[in-house]
């Protein structure tokens, strides 16, 4: 009888272990697992002690290249207090974690980026009185917005909300514009298709003025709305001044 009870106990323990293992397995499948993407050590709160900045990403399987979400953790080098920040819009592959001074206060902001299809997603945040606050958010990722229209003689006319204008010469792709039926060989617009602009395809931090304060250099593509024919690149520079402000813009072939 004792032997029977012992065997029964082993069976019950085995069933419990299997149940727990399956529960854990199913939980991982449905919610994903969290992985450390990158870790940096630097002073982000001006106490002359190195703080630990960690970027975590959640994905379903270790071999997946696409992350479903990201979480930023900053651990105070003195108190070991942890502060967390999860930008809800951030997802994608090839994530990066960088530290740059965008505001000019000699302390770095935290910049995370990831590729999401043909666009780049970026979140920039800073530690402000023990709270991680975003300074570059979801709406900033749309890039420069302007009204675009085809003009005569293979050109694009662009207008910004503040009234400024942008003129784009498309002579370099005249054969494509005529073969797509957008222009006649003589340069007359045939009222077919319209130009549009993509979100950022690239957004990098760069100390353009070599003064230790970083700006954002963004690249967008002007394309035809219906046929997605690339027309030119739009390069923009954004400097922080109570928010990132457009300071320069030009187009390139």
Predicted segments, located by residue:
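Acidic, small-residue rich beta-repeat scaffolds with periodic aromatic anchors
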Residues: 1-29, 115-253
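Terminal domain-start segments
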Residues: 18-87, 184-190, 194
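Beta-propeller blade termini
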Residues: 35-44, 94-102, 150-155, 202-208
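Acidic/hydrophobic-patterned starts of short beta strands in beta-sheet-rich repeat architectures
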Residues: 46-56, 103-114, 211-219
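Short small/polar-residue motifs
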Residues: 49-54, 94, 196-204
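Short, solvent-exposed coil/turn segments
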Residues: 67, 92, 231-233
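Blade-loop segments of beta-propeller domains
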Residues: 80-102
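N-terminal post-signal-peptidase region of extra-cytosolic proteins
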Residues: 94-97, 110, 221
